[in-house]
Regions:
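Ser/Thr/Gly-rich low-complexity blocks that favor extended beta-strand/coil architectures
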Residues: 103, 127-129, 138, 152-206, ...
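Small/polar beta-strand repeat architecture
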Residues: 186-240, 373-417, 425-426
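Extracellular beta-strand-rich solenoid/capping regions of secreted or surface-exposed proteins
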Residues: 38-43, 60-93, 102-121, 129-146, ...
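The right-handed parallel beta-helix/beta-solenoid scaffold, focusing on the short coil/turn
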Residues: 49, 56, 82, 90-92, ...
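Short glycine/acidic-rich loop motifs that flank beta-strands on beta-rich extracellular proteins
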Residues: 62, 103-109, 129-133, 242-244, ...
Length: 601
């Protein structure tokens, strides 16, 4: 390090020691501070570190960021530019003191790996230029296969080059096409009523008068509404670069008063981590901004975590995927190596490189056609073949009826989950999608969703996210105008998505209670359940609204398929829907419906 660099670093950083940690005070400065922070972390003498920022607005560029190849679940793998890299610390505290952290370009702002205690508090994250393209829809001609936009320019970055849009043009990166796109209500910024997910790849773009662009796409089936704001986040291959916060193989984690206005993937992503709290925090668009998207994927995401997870008093809005997704991972049996060893495969390309198990983990064996968890066995050896295949050796002999195409699920890494007192609305996809066999409590939340508000869905198909639930309590929530996209959903939807080798009738999820909720809805469907054993729907108040025209007016309020032991009691409905309960022959055998008001049993 040069003498000048040393002097600058000393001016920006001051060091002190408390009883437990090395405290690094970071004074405010203008310009790029990324390398200063990197040096502070890398030169820390203790394994207990606290970064304390003087309140201010800080800029983080990628020129001198750490470059590291990362496998990131549900994102694109590759070299990532990391600003805050914490690896192997006993404890880490980051205190922003109300600061704003502004990033530019493809960046993984925070990565925590192998840390025993983490606390991040009092900080807001944003990007100076969002990785998005949006414009007001001013005209549509379905017959001629075009729509016209007046693109936003202030605060956005894009160019029209050779009759195609290039964006964002930051650090020589552009998406290959407009990609994943949705129309939004210009006033509320919510996804537009009746909207469908669409992937936009224009054949060509014409420049018209007054800053208007005409987009031709000959295979487009669903056109945006004139007056809406059409927003695009880029092609699927590149539009999940990294989460704002990546935490893996860590424990005892607290985020408090942390707000994310933009990120190039998820907001908070946790892999194989234990005991997590997200408190008084948020993912939402900055006040006064004309952006209609906050972050490009889930607000929060938990993959193969354990211990207790709590999300409380948070606000999640504007993201382009779920409010939260909690799941394990199914791996598929590729080959039986010997009596104790099996080769397994990660099946989704955004799972490649994920650590499914380590020595000492207990694993369930699930053998088609039944989706039921069968015997357990303990892993004694893990041999990674590559990012796709791994050999697992077990303590006991593998069952002789295990075969290629069956799946394994990690028993050790499953969390209990509580979501309390949050507001989740005005975003793509579902408020909550969750799959864990341990206790789930969802209470006192304000929820409004494009798709189903709450979805319980394990799947041995596509994402291969495990697994079936065994104890769920959904109570005292306020649901407002949920499932307003074009596709058919419900307030609560339970729908396993299993591969062709698995039974489509065997019971999958169990012991779900949906009680004391207030539901204000423009449409009919409240609960849509498939293959549930033990579903209680009681003491809910349902009120019809006239916010939108019903999308599926012929749907039943409660729709049951291949279910067992369902009780629908003491619910009250006020509105004009007359179709109350629909149940197939299997569900009717053990169905109890009584003491409801306002709809037919």
């Amino acid at each position: 390090m040069s003498k000048i660099s040393k002097i600058i670093l000393i001016c920006v950083l001051t060091f002190s020691h408390s009883y437990a940690s090395e405290i690094i005070h970071i004074k405010h400065q203008d310009g790029d501070i990324a390398y200063t922070v990197r040096q502070a972390i890398e030169n820390a003498k203790d394994k207990d570190i606290e970064l304390v920022f003087e309140k201010g607005t800080y800029t983080f560029l990628t020129k001198y960021a750490l470059s590291k190849y990362l496998y990131v679940t549900n994102h694109g793998n590759g070299f990532k530019k990391i600003i805050f890299n914490f690896n192997g610390f006993n404890s880490v505290v980051v205190n922003g003191n109300g600061s704003q952290f502004i990033f530019r370009g493809q960046t993984a702002p925070f990565v925590f790996e192998g840390c025993k205690k983490i606390e991040v508090k009092n900080v807001t994250l944003d990007w100076d230029i969002p990785f998005s393209f949006q414009g007001d829809v001013v005209a549509v001609n379905k017959k001629e296969h075009w729509y016209e936009l007046k693109p936003y320019t202030k605060g956005f970055s894009w160019k029209l080059v050779r009759k195609r849009i290039e964006f964002p043009g930051i650090n020589n990166f552009n998406f290959s096409n407009l990609g994943s796109s949705l129309p939004h209500n210009k006033k509320t910024k919510a996804v537009d009523y009746g909207a469908w997910d669409r992937s936009l790849k224009s054949n060509f773009v014409e420049e018209k008068a007054n800053g208007v662009l005409r987009f031709y796409q000959y295979d487009l089936k669903k056109f945006p509404r004139v007056g809406s704001v059409l927003q695009s986040k880029g092609d699927k291959k590149n539009n999940r670069y990294a989460p704002a916060f990546l935490v893996r193989n860590s424990k005892d984690i607290v985020f408090d008063n942390v707000v994310i206005h933009h990120a190039l993937g998820m907001g908070f992503l946790f892999e194989r981590s234990e005991n997590i709290k997200i408190l008084n925090s948020g993912v939402y668009i900055r006040e006064g901004s004309d952006r209609v998207m906050s972050i490009v994927a889930d607000a929060t995401h938990f993959a193969n975590c354990k211990g207790d997870i709590l999300i409380e008093n948070c606000r999640f809005e504007g993201m382009y995927d779920d409010g939260t997704n909690v799941h394990g991972t199914y791996v598929e049996v590729d080959k039986i190596i010997d009596s104790k060893t099996v080769r397994v495969a990660l099946k989704h390309n955004q799972q490649y490189g994920f650590e499914f198990a380590e020595e000492g983990d207990e694993v369930w064996f699930i053998k088609a056609p039944s989706p039921t968890r069968k015997e357990t066995n303990t892993v004694t050896k893990v041999k990674v073949i590559n990012d796709h295949y791994t050999d697992l050796t077990f303590k006991n002999d593998i069952a002789t009826d295990l075969k290629s195409g069956d799946v394994l699920e990690n028993k050790t890494w499953n969390p209990s989950f509580t979501m309390r007192g949050n507001t989740i609305r005005d975003h793509r996809a579902r408020n909550i999608i969750i799959k864990t066999p341990k206790k789930i409590v969802i209470e006192n939340n304000n929820l409004s969703s494009m798709m189903s508000s709450i979805m319980l869905r394990g799947e041995t198909f596509y994402w291969f996210e495990s697994g079936n639930v065994e104890e769920v309590i959904i109570k005292n929530n306020h649901f407002k105008d949920c499932a307003y996209s074009g596709s058919e959903h419900a307030v609560l939807k339970v729908s396993p998505r299993l591969g062709a080798a698995f039974s489509s009738t065997d019971l999958y999820d169990r012991n779900i209670v949906f009680e004391n909720n207030t539901i204000e809805t423009f449409d009919s469907r409240i609960v849509w359940a498939d293959r549930v054993d033990g579903l209680v729907i009681k003491n809910n108040t349902i009120k019809q609204t006239h916010t939108f025209k019903p999308l599926y007016p012929n749907a039943f309020m409660f729709d049951l398929i291949n279910c067992s032991n369902v009780k629908i009691t003491n619910n009250t409905y006020k509105g004009t829907v007359t179709k109350g309960v629909q149940a197939d022959a299997t569900s009717k055998k053990t169905l109890l419906v009584k003491k409801n008001k306002g709809f037919k049993n």
